[in-house]
């Protein structure tokens, strides 16, 4: 049975909660996308840079509210990294999904937000996108700096990796067959073109690459989330 995964979501939630799923009972097949979190404010916000937002946070501890799609999802991971690296006293507001989190920022219900690059790029006319939580700038937003360029040492651990998986115990020949076919399917010109037309970043990874990524995220998130629930 094929299923879709979203990392860091399922890994973070398996660390914090007593879930029935974790990286030990799932087998990755291949990865098709990697959608970074971006730091956004409303189009009428007085803040134009990460530095300006953090200066306001320093002067007003706890007053800078930042929305995200929920708890222990990519946006929340980006927030935790941002707060830790900047040392700022910030308040996270978990929404009931990415669309609601985006709406909060547009409506001025929160000072800022972390949201998907794909969704934010489609709503760019209603937002200011201050920074990307990734190791490099993105081709869809070439003028938007990374958080590291903005002086905050946040890496790519919150990037939403998306792909396909099967349950552990699936016959190895089935896993091998799917792993040999699925990444090629994701890389087809029509598929990549469709993703690009919706500002959905593609990142094609084979099974071995996904296994390595899962293990890296498991180790990092176990440390980041220690003591949180």
Predicted regions and their residues:
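Hinge/capping helix and adjacent helix->loop/strand transition within the periplasmic-binding protein
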Residues: 1, 13-100, 147-149, 161-194
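Conserved beta-strand termini and adjacent loop/short-helix elements that scaffold enzyme active sites
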Residues: 5, 69, 93-98, 115, ...
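A ligand-binding cleft/hinge motif common to bilobed small-molecule-binding domains
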Residues: 7-17, 76, 81-85, 107, ...
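Conserved functional loop/turn residues at catalytic and ligand-binding sites
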Residues: 49, 108-109, 126, 151, ...
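Short acidic active-site motifs
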Residues: 100-101, 209
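C-terminal lobe and pocket-closing loops
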Residues: 118-187, 216-219
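Mature extracytoplasmic/periplasmic domains
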Residues: 183, 187, 191-212
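Extracellular/periplasmic bilobal clamshell ligand-binding domains
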Residues: 206-229
């Amino acid at each position: 049975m094929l299923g879709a995964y979203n990392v860091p979501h399922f890994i973070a939630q398996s660390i914090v909660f007593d879930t029935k799923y974790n990286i030990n009972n799932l087998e990755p097949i291949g990865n098709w996308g990697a959608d970074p979190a971006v730091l956004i404010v409303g189009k009428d916000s007085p803040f134009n840079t990460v530095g300006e937002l953090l200066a306001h946070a320093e002067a007003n501890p706890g007053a800078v509210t930042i929305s995200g799609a929920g708890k222990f999802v990519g946006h929340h991971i980006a927030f935790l990294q941002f707060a830790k690296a900047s040392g700022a006293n910030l308040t996270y507001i978990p929404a009931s999904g990415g669309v609601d989190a985006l709406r909060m920022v547009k409506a001025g219900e929160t000072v800022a937000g972390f949201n998907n690059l794909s969704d934010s790029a489609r709503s760019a006319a209603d937002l200011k996108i201050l920074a990307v939580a990734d190791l490099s700038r993105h081709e869809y937003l070439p003028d938007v700096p990374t958080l590291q360029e903005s002086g905050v040492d946040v890496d790519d651990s919150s990037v939403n990796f998306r792909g396909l998986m099967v349950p552990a115990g699936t016959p190895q020949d089935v896993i091998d067959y799917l792993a040999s076919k699925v990444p090629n399917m994701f890389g087809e010109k029509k598929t990549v073109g469709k993703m690009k037309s919706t500002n959905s970043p593609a990142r094609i990874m084979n099974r071995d690459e996904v296994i390595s990524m899962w293990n890296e995220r498991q180790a990092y998130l176990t440390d980041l989330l220690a003591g949180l629930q």
